[in-house]
Amino acid sequence: MRKTKIVCTIGPASESEEMLEKLMKAGMNVARLNFSHGSHEEHKARIDTIRKVADRLGKTIGILLDTKGPEIRTHDMKDGLIMLEKGKEVIVSMSQVEGTPEKFSVTYEDLINDVQVGSYILLDDGLVELQVKDIDKTKGEVKCDILNTGELKNKKGVNLPGVKVNLPGITDKDADDILFGIKEDVDYIAASFVRRPSDVLDIREILERENNHNITIFPKIENQEGIDNIEEILEVSDGLMVARGDMGVEIPPESVPIVQKDLIRKCNKLGKPVITATQMLDSMQRNPRATRAEASDVANAIYDGTDAVMLSGETAAGLYPEEAVKTMRNIAVSAEAAQDYKKLLSDRTKLVETSLVNAIGVSVAHTALNLNVKAIVAATESGSTAVTISKYRPHSDIIAVTPSEHTARQLALVWGAYPVIKKGRKTTDDLLNNAVATAVETGRVTNGDLIIITAGVPTGEKGTTNMMKLHLVGDEIAKGQGVGRGSVVGKTVVANSASDLEGVDLSESVIVTNSVDETLVPYIEQAVGLITEENGITSPSAIIGLEKSIPTIIGVENATKELKDGILVTVDAAQGKIFEGYANVL
């Protein structure tokens, strides 16, 4: 099972039912809606279509609302475009004017108070660079030298690298969009241009005022101020998005990979999901194949420890949205297969802080690795159990069984977690039985698989992960007292006397008999296992089992009547249990 999650931006190229179905089948886990573009009516139509297709396919798909944020843009230019020439001067006005090569204006009136002589102003993702030469606060004008030639069109982005700006945490539009998201029951908010913890708390205040406790907040770190305040920002956040687009304009491009690794590591330490975004497969907007550099970029983000990787224009407006998702999926699967999970677990154990809940998580991960369990089944109300285990990046699949649709969609973004919605768990026994049955229903585990079940007891309390149980999936058909510690798989041969075994090939057989006498010994020596009804560790059955090092179970009531000839069984002498079929016992 692929463990790294894929976020796809939904736009004109991907909003149809047909294409959404293709993206979901290709590997999309979360649908991102960019509120920098489009009306509420357009986004509602997309949300409805996403949920309709997901329900039809039986998929759990999260929905992420990406705010426009408090960005700075230019106003309109004369004839829609002006040319700025290197070596000349241009005035940036705080009052709205029609842009000319001599003067244009910006949407942020306090820019004049934030910059100083020598500050840089970058236009249109850094394609045009200005340097502040003089500031005239009386006129509300900033005179700049033009450092390189370039075109400037209407409403282009403005970046102020290294400058602390006094923009609000969220705009009126953002607040309106968030209220819309609450009404439409979105799962996550990606908050654009977050600079300080108060920016996140402004959003949290809206959610709390609306009594919403389901939506999680992922600040987008896109500037130096956000990088500098990352520790405090993470304290009030549920996760993080490493938004490399504007970040690569605000800080030197060569610093972006270093910052990316640092931000991901900080999230990993706290066990908070992190998304790596922007230009991951950018060339696939135009071409059906990714470049080698892009493949390396996606893989290295996974090696860095990201929970999810994101596609932007590739799926929103590109020519090959389905191919982009498939490519990202294949890169993720390949990168995960090359991971050294033993080393990964060791590194995570050292990185993540010790706590009672984390102690269970790390124990689950170590046990899963040492015993090579097929899956970890996390029974969870809030999702915290699955998140706790995910911190340690276990090789085994994490099947998160939850009664909550909201929790399932939240887990769509968590590394390694496969959420399954299942109602009805009132007692601990119900919880365990329900978890096992649900895991089998997914097809990811089958009879004979060794799994770990983990949960919080009592049920329903967030952050109380405190239970771990090893469980063998399958039907236990009989039990008694085991002799020795081995296990074996074979077909039963029921024998009431030695004559029943004459001429029978016993090389892969388990003999089932009432008791053992000397006439049976030559046949028992040929068999792989022994099951008898007689009791006692000093009985002939126990003695012959020990002497011949044959996995033996004694004291199995009515064995010769209950166990039929020719059925495949697993004899587990360590537990004194007999399972139908093959069971992966220790």
UniProtKB/Swiss-Prot annotation:
Site positions for Transition state stabilizer: K220
InterPro entries tied to this protein: PEP-util_enz_mobile_dom, Phosphohistidine_dom_sf, Pyr_Knase, Pyrv/PenolPyrv_kinase-like_dom, Pyrv_kinase-like_dom_sf, Pyrv_Knase-like_insert_dom_sf, Pyrv_Knase_brl, Pyrv_Knase_C
Listed EC numbers: 2.7.1.40
Molecular function in Gene Ontology: ATP binding; kinase activity; magnesium ion binding; potassium ion binding; pyruvate kinase activity
Enzyme class at the top of the EC tree: transferase
Binding site for Mg(2+): E222, D246
Name of protein: Pyruvate kinase
